[in-house]
């Protein structure tokens, strides 16, 4: 009989950027069918179709579990400062029961500074707040995520 034998690997646990005591939340991004998540901006008609749980006027929203928001004294539609080791941005709070406690979720495809007045300065560019998480064994990117904090503005 053939047996597959894999070598024993002493892999380290993957660590997100940022001290968890200073940045107690985990920030991840989400994609939307209505927004281009790449370098190109979304067409204006798609921006009009974006839900108001993602973008209100020019303010980008983040999803956070009501329990987590409550511990921080934050409520629906309140403005907060989202800070990571890589940067900070003003965001609006959207309470979402579907978001895991301790997590903050931000939409991809917003925060462009070009592409005309209709797309520029709408929401937050998540790329300025987070970076790749490298697998210590292979050096390859494993996930998007970073430690973060939210504070009332």
What are the functions of these language-model segments?
Residues 40-63, 67-153:
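Long, contiguous, secondary-structure-rich segments that constitute the structural scaffold
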Residues 1-53:
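Long, low-complexity segments enriched in small/aliphatic residues
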């Amino acid at each position: 009989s053939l047996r597959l034998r894999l070598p024993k690997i002493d892999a380290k646990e993957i660590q997100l950027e940022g001290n968890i005591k200073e940045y107690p939340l985990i920030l991840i991004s989400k994609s939307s069918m209505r927004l281009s998540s790449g370098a190109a901006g979304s067409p204006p008609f798609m921006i009009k179709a974006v839900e108001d749980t993602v973008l209100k006027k020019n303010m980008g929203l983040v999803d956070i579990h009501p329990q987590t928001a409550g511990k921080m004294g934050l409520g629906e539609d309140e403005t907060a400062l989202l800070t990571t080791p890589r940067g900070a941005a003003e965001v609006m709070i959207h309470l979402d029961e579907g978001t895991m406690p301790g997590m903050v979720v931000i939409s991809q495809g917003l925060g462009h500074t070009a592409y005309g007045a209709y797309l520029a300065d709408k929401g937050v560019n998540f790329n300025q707040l987070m970076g790749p998480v490298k697998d210590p064994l292979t050096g390859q990117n494993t996930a998007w995520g970073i430690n973060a904090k939210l504070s009332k503005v």
